[in-house]
Amino acid sequence: MTQLKQARKGIVTPEMEAVAKTEGLQPEFILKGIADGNIVIPANKLRKNLKLCGIGKGLSTKVNANIGTSTDFGSVASEVEKLKMAEMVGADTIMDLSTGPKINTIRKAILENTCLPLGTVPVYQAAVEAKDHYGAMVKMTADDLFGAIESQAKEGVDFVTVHCGVTRQVIDTFKGQGRLTDIVSRGGTFTAGWMVFHGAENPLYEHFDRLLDICREYDVTLSLGDGLRPGCIADATDRAQVAELLVLGELVKRAREAEVQVMVEGPGHVPLNQIEANVRLQKSICEDAPFYVLGPLVTDIAPGYDHITGAIGGAIAAAAGADFLCYVTPAEHLSLPDVTDVRNGVIASRIAAHAADIVKGVNGAAERDHQMAIARKKLDWETQLKLSLDPEHARVTRDRFKTRGKACSMCGDFCAMELAEKHLGVSVSRC
Protein backbone atom coordinates (compact mmCIF):
# COMPACT_ATOMS: atom_id res chain seq x y z
CA MET A 1 0.00 0.00 0.00
CA THR A 2 1.45 3.38 -1.00
CA GLN A 3 1.87 6.31 1.35
CA LEU A 4 -0.84 8.10 -0.64
CA LYS A 5 -3.33 5.25 -0.29
CA GLN A 6 -2.69 4.97 3.44
CA ALA A 7 -3.06 8.72 3.89
CA ARG A 8 -6.44 8.63 2.17
CA LYS A 9 -7.49 5.87 4.55
CA GLY A 10 -6.47 8.07 7.48
CA ILE A 11 -3.52 5.87 8.44
CA VAL A 12 -0.54 7.72 9.92
CA THR A 13 2.47 5.68 8.82
CA PRO A 14 5.87 5.54 10.55
CA GLU A 15 7.23 7.49 7.57
CA MET A 16 4.72 10.28 8.15
CA GLU A 17 5.56 10.35 11.86
CA ALA A 18 9.29 10.57 11.11
CA VAL A 19 8.83 13.44 8.66
CA ALA A 20 6.55 15.25 11.11
CA LYS A 21 9.18 14.97 13.84
CA THR A 22 11.91 16.31 11.56
CA GLU A 23 9.75 19.25 10.48
CA GLY A 24 8.43 20.02 13.97
CA LEU A 25 4.84 19.45 12.82
CA GLN A 26 1.96 17.18 13.74
CA PRO A 27 1.71 13.84 11.89
CA GLU A 28 -1.84 14.73 10.87
CA PHE A 29 -0.49 17.69 8.90
CA ILE A 30 1.77 15.38 6.90
CA LEU A 31 -1.06 12.89 6.41
CA LYS A 32 -3.38 15.56 5.01
CA GLY A 33 -0.67 16.93 2.72
CA ILE A 34 0.01 13.50 1.27
CA ALA A 35 -3.71 12.74 0.91
CA ASP A 36 -4.20 16.04 -0.92
CA GLY A 37 -1.19 15.41 -3.14
CA ASN A 38 0.81 18.47 -2.08
CA ILE A 39 3.37 16.51 -0.02
CA VAL A 40 5.37 13.45 -1.05
CA ILE A 41 7.70 11.17 0.88
CA PRO A 42 10.05 9.48 -1.61
CA ALA A 43 10.55 6.11 0.06
CA ASN A 44 10.65 2.88 -1.90
CA LYS A 45 9.07 0.20 0.27
CA LEU A 46 12.15 -1.99 -0.25
CA ARG A 47 14.65 0.57 1.11
CA LYS A 48 16.03 -0.03 4.58
CA ASN A 49 17.47 2.52 7.03
CA LEU A 50 16.27 5.41 4.88
CA LYS A 51 16.63 8.96 6.17
CA LEU A 52 13.11 10.07 5.37
CA CYS A 53 12.45 13.35 3.63
CA GLY A 54 9.13 15.11 3.12
CA ILE A 55 8.80 17.43 0.13
CA GLY A 56 5.96 19.86 -0.37
CA LYS A 57 3.64 22.51 0.96
CA GLY A 58 4.28 23.69 4.50
CA LEU A 59 7.61 21.86 4.79
CA SER A 60 11.18 23.15 4.68
CA THR A 61 12.59 23.54 1.18
CA LYS A 62 14.66 20.51 0.25
CA VAL A 63 17.89 20.29 -1.78
CA ASN A 64 18.90 17.55 -4.19
CA ALA A 65 22.47 16.82 -5.30
CA ASN A 66 23.11 15.24 -8.70
CA ILE A 67 26.08 12.92 -9.07
CA GLY A 68 26.98 10.31 -11.67
CA THR A 69 29.44 9.38 -14.39
CA SER A 70 29.69 10.53 -18.00
CA THR A 71 30.72 8.51 -21.04
CA ASP A 72 34.36 9.54 -20.55
CA PHE A 73 34.85 10.10 -16.83
CA GLY A 74 33.83 8.70 -13.47
CA SER A 75 34.26 5.61 -11.34
CA VAL A 76 32.56 3.95 -8.41
CA ALA A 77 35.11 5.47 -6.05
CA SER A 78 34.71 9.01 -7.40
CA GLU A 79 30.92 8.90 -7.26
CA VAL A 80 30.86 7.51 -3.73
CA GLU A 81 33.25 10.31 -2.73
CA LYS A 82 30.85 12.88 -4.21
CA LEU A 83 27.97 11.15 -2.47
CA LYS A 84 29.67 11.37 0.91
CA MET A 85 30.47 15.04 0.37
CA ALA A 86 26.86 15.81 -0.56
CA GLU A 87 25.67 14.05 2.57
CA MET A 88 28.22 15.83 4.76
CA VAL A 89 27.19 19.31 3.66
CA GLY A 90 23.48 18.67 4.00
CA ALA A 91 21.86 17.45 0.79
CA ASP A 92 18.40 16.00 1.43
CA THR A 93 18.32 13.66 -1.57
CA ILE A 94 20.68 12.28 -4.21
CA MET A 95 20.16 11.65 -7.90
CA ASP A 96 22.37 9.32 -9.92
CA LEU A 97 22.59 10.68 -13.47
CA SER A 98 25.24 8.25 -14.70
CA THR A 99 25.56 7.66 -18.43
CA GLY A 100 28.99 6.02 -18.41
CA PRO A 101 30.19 2.43 -18.35
CA LYS A 102 29.04 0.14 -15.52
CA ILE A 103 25.92 2.23 -15.06
CA ASN A 104 24.17 -0.44 -13.00
CA THR A 105 27.23 -0.99 -10.80
CA ILE A 106 27.45 2.73 -10.04
CA ARG A 107 23.79 2.95 -9.05
CA LYS A 108 23.97 -0.10 -6.80
CA ALA A 109 27.09 1.28 -5.11
CA ILE A 110 25.32 4.56 -4.41
CA LEU A 111 22.32 2.72 -2.97
CA GLU A 112 24.61 0.68 -0.73
CA ASN A 113 26.46 3.76 0.53
CA THR A 114 23.69 6.20 1.33
CA CYS A 115 20.70 6.48 3.62
CA LEU A 116 19.31 9.43 1.63
CA PRO A 117 16.42 9.01 -0.82
CA LEU A 118 17.81 8.20 -4.28
CA GLY A 119 16.39 9.33 -7.59
CA THR A 120 17.32 8.32 -11.13
CA VAL A 121 16.44 8.96 -14.76
CA PRO A 122 15.77 5.40 -16.01
CA VAL A 123 15.86 6.37 -19.69
CA TYR A 124 19.61 6.89 -19.23
CA GLN A 125 20.06 3.21 -18.43
CA ALA A 126 17.80 2.20 -21.31
CA ALA A 127 19.69 4.47 -23.72
CA VAL A 128 23.15 3.31 -22.63
CA GLU A 129 22.15 -0.34 -22.90
CA ALA A 130 20.49 0.20 -26.28
CA LYS A 131 23.66 1.79 -27.61
CA ASP A 132 25.66 -1.21 -26.35
CA HIS A 133 23.21 -3.84 -27.62
CA TYR A 134 21.79 -2.31 -30.80
CA GLY A 135 24.40 0.27 -31.75
CA ALA A 136 22.12 3.28 -31.27
CA MET A 137 20.10 4.78 -28.44
CA VAL A 138 17.01 5.27 -30.62
CA LYS A 139 16.77 1.53 -31.25
CA MET A 140 15.69 0.79 -27.69
CA THR A 141 12.20 -0.63 -27.32
CA ALA A 142 9.39 0.41 -25.03
CA ASP A 143 9.98 -2.84 -23.14
CA ASP A 144 13.63 -1.87 -22.68
CA LEU A 145 12.56 1.41 -21.11
CA PHE A 146 9.95 -0.08 -18.80
CA GLY A 147 12.36 -2.87 -17.94
CA ALA A 148 14.89 -0.30 -16.75
CA ILE A 149 12.25 1.43 -14.64
CA GLU A 150 11.12 -1.80 -13.03
CA SER A 151 14.62 -3.11 -12.37
CA GLN A 152 15.56 0.14 -10.64
CA ALA A 153 12.37 0.05 -8.58
CA LYS A 154 13.25 -3.48 -7.48
CA GLU A 155 16.70 -2.26 -6.41
CA GLY A 156 15.14 0.34 -4.13
CA VAL A 157 15.24 3.62 -6.09
CA ASP A 158 12.91 6.06 -4.34
CA PHE A 159 11.92 8.46 -7.12
CA VAL A 160 12.28 8.47 -10.89
CA THR A 161 12.38 11.31 -13.37
CA VAL A 162 10.31 10.37 -16.40
CA HIS A 163 9.71 12.66 -19.36
CA CYS A 164 6.10 11.65 -19.98
CA GLY A 165 5.02 15.10 -21.16
CA VAL A 166 7.11 15.06 -24.34
CA THR A 167 4.25 14.00 -26.61
CA ARG A 168 3.91 14.20 -30.39
CA GLN A 169 1.61 17.18 -30.04
CA VAL A 170 4.06 18.94 -27.72
CA ILE A 171 6.91 18.25 -30.17
CA ASP A 172 4.82 19.85 -32.92
CA THR A 173 4.40 22.91 -30.72
CA PHE A 174 8.15 22.93 -30.08
CA LYS A 175 8.93 22.77 -33.81
CA GLY A 176 6.54 25.61 -34.54
CA GLN A 177 7.88 27.69 -31.68
CA GLY A 178 11.52 28.01 -32.69
CA ARG A 179 14.14 28.19 -29.96
CA LEU A 180 17.70 29.36 -29.49
CA THR A 181 18.78 26.26 -27.58
CA ASP A 182 16.22 23.68 -28.74
CA ILE A 183 16.04 20.79 -26.21
CA VAL A 184 18.64 20.81 -23.42
CA SER A 185 17.24 18.00 -21.28
CA ARG A 186 19.10 14.76 -22.01
CA GLY A 187 16.03 12.72 -21.14
CA GLY A 188 13.89 15.00 -23.26
CA THR A 189 16.27 14.67 -26.20
CA PHE A 190 16.48 10.87 -25.87
CA THR A 191 12.69 10.69 -25.81
CA ALA A 192 12.10 13.09 -28.69
CA GLY A 193 14.79 11.39 -30.78
CA TRP A 194 13.18 8.00 -30.20
CA MET A 195 9.77 9.34 -31.18
CA VAL A 196 11.05 10.85 -34.43
CA PHE A 197 13.03 7.73 -35.33
CA HIS A 198 10.05 5.41 -34.78
CA GLY A 199 7.32 7.82 -35.86
CA ALA A 200 5.55 6.86 -32.65
CA GLU A 201 4.11 8.37 -29.49
CA ASN A 202 6.19 8.64 -26.32
CA PRO A 203 5.81 5.21 -24.66
CA LEU A 204 5.87 6.80 -21.21
CA TYR A 205 2.80 8.81 -22.18
CA GLU A 206 1.07 6.17 -24.29
CA HIS A 207 1.54 3.49 -21.63
CA PHE A 208 1.38 5.73 -18.57
CA ASP A 209 -0.76 3.19 -16.73
CA ARG A 210 2.06 0.66 -17.04
CA LEU A 211 4.39 3.16 -15.39
CA LEU A 212 1.86 3.75 -12.63
CA ASP A 213 1.58 0.02 -11.98
CA ILE A 214 5.33 -0.21 -11.37
CA CYS A 215 5.42 2.84 -9.12
CA ARG A 216 2.40 1.72 -7.12
CA GLU A 217 3.90 -1.74 -6.49
CA TYR A 218 7.10 -0.33 -4.97
CA ASP A 219 5.78 3.07 -3.83
CA VAL A 220 8.23 4.86 -6.09
CA THR A 221 7.50 8.58 -6.34
CA LEU A 222 7.04 9.91 -9.85
CA SER A 223 8.99 13.04 -10.73
CA LEU A 224 7.46 14.26 -13.98
CA GLY A 225 10.41 15.65 -15.90
CA ASP A 226 10.41 18.84 -17.93
CA GLY A 227 11.92 17.60 -21.17
CA LEU A 228 11.33 20.96 -22.83
CA ARG A 229 12.65 23.17 -20.07
CA PRO A 230 14.28 26.35 -21.39
CA GLY A 231 18.04 26.16 -21.88
CA CYS A 232 18.52 29.92 -21.98
CA ILE A 233 16.57 32.86 -20.63
CA ALA A 234 15.43 33.80 -24.15
CA ASP A 235 13.49 30.51 -24.34
CA ALA A 236 11.86 30.83 -20.92
CA THR A 237 8.09 30.44 -20.55
CA ASP A 238 7.55 29.79 -24.25
CA ARG A 239 4.69 27.84 -25.82
CA ALA A 240 6.64 24.58 -25.90
CA GLN A 241 7.40 24.73 -22.18
CA VAL A 242 3.81 25.53 -21.30
CA ALA A 243 2.40 22.90 -23.68
CA GLU A 244 4.40 20.23 -21.86
CA LEU A 245 3.32 21.59 -18.48
CA LEU A 246 -0.34 21.24 -19.49
CA VAL A 247 0.26 17.55 -20.23
CA LEU A 248 2.02 17.12 -16.90
CA GLY A 249 -1.01 18.61 -15.14
CA GLU A 250 -3.19 15.89 -16.66
CA LEU A 251 -0.71 13.20 -15.64
CA VAL A 252 -0.58 14.47 -12.06
CA LYS A 253 -4.31 13.86 -11.85
CA ARG A 254 -3.97 10.34 -13.26
CA ALA A 255 -1.13 9.49 -10.87
CA ARG A 256 -3.16 10.64 -7.88
CA GLU A 257 -6.15 8.61 -9.05
CA ALA A 258 -3.82 5.57 -9.15
CA GLU A 259 -2.64 6.42 -5.61
CA VAL A 260 0.93 7.05 -6.78
CA GLN A 261 2.89 9.92 -5.24
CA VAL A 262 3.88 12.52 -7.81
CA MET A 263 5.85 15.75 -8.08
CA VAL A 264 6.62 17.96 -11.07
CA GLU A 265 9.93 19.28 -12.36
CA GLY A 266 10.43 22.79 -13.66
CA PRO A 267 12.82 25.12 -15.40
CA GLY A 268 15.62 25.72 -16.12
CA HIS A 269 16.88 29.11 -17.29
CA VAL A 270 14.41 31.83 -16.28
CA PRO A 271 14.94 35.60 -15.87
CA LEU A 272 14.16 37.03 -12.46
CA ASN A 273 10.92 38.69 -13.53
CA GLN A 274 9.40 35.40 -14.76
CA ILE A 275 10.24 33.08 -11.86
CA GLU A 276 7.24 33.75 -9.64
CA ALA A 277 4.90 33.48 -12.63
CA ASN A 278 6.40 30.08 -13.50
CA VAL A 279 5.84 28.81 -9.97
CA ARG A 280 2.26 30.09 -9.87
CA LEU A 281 1.56 28.56 -13.27
CA GLN A 282 2.84 25.14 -12.22
CA LYS A 283 0.99 25.21 -8.93
CA SER A 284 -2.25 26.09 -10.70
CA ILE A 285 -1.99 23.64 -13.61
CA CYS A 286 -0.64 20.78 -11.48
CA GLU A 287 -3.06 21.35 -8.59
CA ASP A 288 -0.42 22.18 -6.00
CA ALA A 289 1.79 19.15 -6.67
CA PRO A 290 5.27 19.57 -5.15
CA PHE A 291 7.46 21.60 -7.51
CA TYR A 292 11.08 20.53 -8.13
CA VAL A 293 13.16 23.19 -9.92
CA LEU A 294 16.61 23.11 -11.49
CA GLY A 295 17.96 26.42 -10.27
CA PRO A 296 16.41 28.21 -12.00
CA LEU A 297 19.41 30.01 -13.48
CA VAL A 298 18.76 33.72 -13.85
CA THR A 299 21.44 34.57 -16.41
CA ASP A 300 23.36 32.66 -19.07
CA ILE A 301 26.71 34.46 -18.86
CA ALA A 302 28.25 33.09 -15.66
CA PRO A 303 29.87 29.73 -16.45
CA GLY A 304 31.99 28.73 -13.48
CA TYR A 305 29.59 30.54 -11.15
CA ASP A 306 26.28 28.91 -11.99
CA HIS A 307 25.91 27.71 -8.41
CA ILE A 308 25.35 31.42 -7.71
CA THR A 309 22.97 32.06 -10.63
CA GLY A 310 21.06 28.95 -9.58
CA ALA A 311 20.91 29.96 -5.92
CA ILE A 312 19.55 33.39 -6.82
CA GLY A 313 16.78 31.82 -8.88
CA GLY A 314 16.21 29.05 -6.37
CA ALA A 315 15.65 31.49 -3.52
CA ILE A 316 13.05 33.41 -5.52
CA ALA A 317 11.34 30.24 -6.77
CA ALA A 318 11.18 28.65 -3.33
CA ALA A 319 9.94 31.86 -1.73
CA ALA A 320 7.18 31.87 -4.36
CA GLY A 321 6.20 28.30 -3.50
CA ALA A 322 8.65 25.85 -5.10
CA ASP A 323 9.33 22.96 -2.75
CA PHE A 324 12.49 21.23 -3.92
CA LEU A 325 15.71 22.70 -5.36
CA CYS A 326 17.99 20.70 -7.59
CA TYR A 327 21.43 22.08 -6.95
CA VAL A 328 23.59 23.62 -9.65
CA THR A 329 27.37 23.37 -9.36
CA PRO A 330 30.16 25.69 -10.57
CA ALA A 331 30.87 23.05 -13.24
CA GLU A 332 27.45 23.47 -14.88
CA HIS A 333 27.79 24.00 -18.65
CA LEU A 334 31.53 23.31 -18.41
CA SER A 335 32.38 19.83 -17.16
CA LEU A 336 31.52 16.88 -14.98
CA PRO A 337 31.49 18.20 -11.39
CA ASP A 338 34.18 17.06 -8.97
CA VAL A 339 33.84 16.68 -5.23
CA THR A 340 34.56 20.37 -4.57
CA ASP A 341 31.90 21.39 -7.08
CA VAL A 342 29.43 19.13 -5.30
CA ARG A 343 30.22 20.80 -1.98
CA ASN A 344 29.82 24.30 -3.36
CA GLY A 345 26.63 23.40 -5.19
CA VAL A 346 24.91 21.94 -2.15
CA ILE A 347 25.89 24.84 0.10
CA ALA A 348 24.69 27.44 -2.43
CA SER A 349 21.32 25.72 -2.78
CA ARG A 350 20.97 25.28 0.98
CA ILE A 351 21.48 29.02 1.42
CA ALA A 352 18.75 29.65 -1.15
CA ALA A 353 16.43 27.15 0.52
CA HIS A 354 16.92 28.67 3.97
CA ALA A 355 16.42 32.22 2.70
CA ALA A 356 13.13 31.11 1.15
CA ASP A 357 12.07 29.26 4.29
CA ILE A 358 12.29 32.51 6.24
CA VAL A 359 9.82 34.05 3.79
CA LYS A 360 7.56 30.99 3.92
CA GLY A 361 7.48 31.04 7.71
CA VAL A 362 8.88 27.53 7.95
CA ASN A 363 9.17 26.30 11.52
CA GLY A 364 12.46 27.47 13.09
CA ALA A 365 13.95 29.16 10.02
CA ALA A 366 13.86 32.78 11.21
CA GLU A 367 14.73 31.74 14.78
CA ARG A 368 18.07 30.40 13.62
CA ASP A 369 18.91 33.81 12.14
CA HIS A 370 17.77 35.48 15.36
CA GLN A 371 20.13 33.31 17.39
CA MET A 372 22.95 34.12 14.97
CA ALA A 373 22.34 37.84 15.48
CA ILE A 374 22.56 37.43 19.26
CA ALA A 375 25.79 35.45 18.95
CA ARG A 376 27.28 38.12 16.69
CA LYS A 377 26.37 40.86 19.16
CA LYS A 378 28.14 38.89 21.89
CA LEU A 379 31.11 38.12 19.62
CA ASP A 380 30.38 34.51 20.53
CA TRP A 381 32.33 32.84 17.76
CA GLU A 382 31.67 29.22 18.71
CA THR A 383 27.92 29.73 18.61
CA GLN A 384 28.19 31.59 15.31
CA LEU A 385 30.13 28.70 13.79
CA LYS A 386 27.67 26.17 15.18
CA LEU A 387 24.71 28.03 13.67
CA SER A 388 26.31 28.52 10.25
CA LEU A 389 25.28 26.44 7.24
CA ASP A 390 28.90 25.42 6.62
CA PRO A 391 30.73 25.46 9.98
CA GLU A 392 33.92 23.96 8.57
CA HIS A 393 34.37 26.68 5.95
CA ALA A 394 33.39 29.39 8.42
CA ARG A 395 35.98 28.17 10.93
CA VAL A 396 38.77 28.02 8.33
CA THR A 397 37.95 31.55 7.20
CA ARG A 398 37.77 32.85 10.77
CA ASP A 399 41.15 31.30 11.66
CA ARG A 400 43.07 32.68 8.68
CA PHE A 401 44.09 35.76 10.67
CA LYS A 402 44.58 35.67 14.44
CA THR A 403 43.54 38.74 16.42
CA ARG A 404 44.43 39.95 19.90
CA GLY A 405 40.87 40.54 21.05
CA LYS A 406 37.47 39.03 20.43
CA ALA A 407 36.73 41.04 17.30
CA CYS A 408 37.39 39.63 13.84
CA SER A 409 40.39 40.61 11.76
CA MET A 410 38.32 42.90 9.53
CA CYS A 411 37.73 45.57 12.20
CA GLY A 412 40.00 44.72 15.13
CA ASP A 413 39.99 47.61 17.61
CA PHE A 414 37.34 49.39 15.54
CA CYS A 415 34.69 46.67 15.89
CA ALA A 416 31.28 48.34 15.58
CA MET A 417 29.67 45.93 18.03
CA GLU A 418 32.27 46.54 20.75
CA LEU A 419 32.30 50.31 20.25
CA ALA A 420 28.50 50.54 20.37
CA GLU A 421 28.37 48.64 23.64
CA LYS A 422 31.26 50.61 25.16
CA HIS A 423 30.20 54.13 24.22
CA LEU A 424 26.44 53.91 23.69
CA GLY A 425 25.59 51.43 26.40
CA VAL A 426 23.90 49.13 23.92
CA SER A 427 24.23 45.72 25.53
CA VAL A 428 23.35 42.29 24.26
CA SER A 429 20.48 42.09 26.73
CA ARG A 430 18.46 44.29 24.40
CA CYS A 431 18.52 41.64 21.65
UniProtKB/Swiss-Prot annotation:
Q: Which residues bind Zn(2+)?
A: 269, 333
Q: Which GO terms describe its molecular function?
A: 4 iron, 4 sulfur cluster binding; carbon-carbon lyase activity; zinc ion binding
Which InterPro entries does the entry mention?
A: ThiC, ThiC/Bza_core_dom, ThiC/BzaA/B
- Catalytic reaction list: 5-amino-1-(5-phospho-beta-D-ribosyl)imidazole + S-adenosyl-L-methionine = 4-amino-2-methyl-5-(phosphooxymethyl)pyrimidine + CO + 5'-deoxyadenosine + formate + L-methionine + 3 H(+)
Tell me which UniProt keywords the record has, alphabetically. Answer: 4Fe-4S, Iron, Iron-sulfur, Lyase, Metal-binding, S-adenosyl-L-methionine, Thiamine biosynthesis, Zinc
Q: Which cofactor does it need?
A: [4Fe-4S] cluster
**GO process terms (BP):** thiamine biosynthetic process; thiamine diphosphate biosynthetic process
What pathway does this protein act in? Answer: Cofactor biosynthesis; thiamine diphosphate biosynthesis
Gene3D superfamilies found in the cross-reference section: 6.10.250.620, Radical SAM ThiC family, central domain
Q: How is the cofactor bound?
A: Binds 1 [4Fe-4S] cluster per subunit. The cluster is coordinated with 3 cysteines and an exchangeable S-adenosyl-L-methionine.
For the ligand (substrate), the binding residues are 66, 95, 124, 163, 185-187, 226-229, 265, 292
Any Pfam family hit: ThiC_Rad_SAM
UniProt-annotated binding residues for [4Fe-4S] cluster: 408, 411, 415
Q: What's this chain's function? A: Catalyzes the synthesis of the hydroxymethylpyrimidine phosphate (HMP-P) moiety of thiamine from aminoimidazole ribotide (AIR) in a radical S-adenosyl-L-methionine (SAM)-dependent reaction.
Q: Which NCBIfam families match?
A: PRK13352.1, thiC
Q: Which family does it belong to?
A: Belongs to the ThiC family.
Protein name as catalogued: Phosphomethylpyrimidine synthase
Q: Which gene encodes it?
A: thiC
